[in-house]
Regions:
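Active-site-adjacent structural elements in folded domains
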Residues: 22
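Beta-strand-rich binding/interaction modules
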Residues: 1-11
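C-terminal beta-rich recognition modules with glycine/proline-rich loops and embedded aromatic residues
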Residues: 10, 16-18, 27, 34-154
């Protein structure tokens, strides 16, 4: 559902992939053949409702991003600045000191380093997946978008 722009190459042959569906590979592979899967890693957000109103969970592809002071020492997860959904820009993704990655974003001329949910809190630090965000409204549930995600950023 989230990967609208997926590319799959099997043994050098491009395979058509439709968002929200599975691809079945029925073939005999030969030594040295490879499968290359490129997923849509654009930024998306899930707007919070009720007690999470005014906040959103941010995704980079299938990965949930988190604010964790260990990865960005300027962050206090209890007092995060509000991000503007329309101005978010992913600058870079780098391996973290653990098994996951860090994601450096720009928003309104400021940078912010987030981590993936897998490594969040692994140093014993506090973290949150719900980030204060403006310019985003909740989307209703739909079978075509069960996670109610929407593209954000530039």
């Amino acid at each position: 559902f989230w990967s609208e722009n997926t590319h799959l190459t099997v043994g050098g042959e491009e395979i058509t992939v439709r968002a929200g569906s599975y691809v079945r590979l029925c073939r005999t592979f030969t030594a040295g053949e490879s499968i290359l899967l490129k997923l849509d890693m654009s930024l998306r957000a899930w707007a919070g409702e009720e007690r999470m109103a005014g906040k959103a969970s941010l995704f980079c592809g299938p990965l949930v991003l988190c604010a964790d002071g260990y990865y960005d020492g300027r962050l206090n997860v209890e007092q995060l600045p509000a991000l503007r959904a329309e101005s978010l820009k992913l600058l870079r993704v780098e391996p973290s000191g653990f098994a996951g990655s860090t994601f450096t974003l720009e928003c309104g001329g400021e940078t912010l380093t987030l981590c993936d949910l897998y490594t969040a809190g692994s140093s014993g630090s506090a973290y949150t997946t719900w980030l204060p965000m403006t310019g985003i409204a909740p989307k209703p549930f739909a079978r075509s978008n069960p996670f109610r995600l929407q593209k954000v950023g530039v």
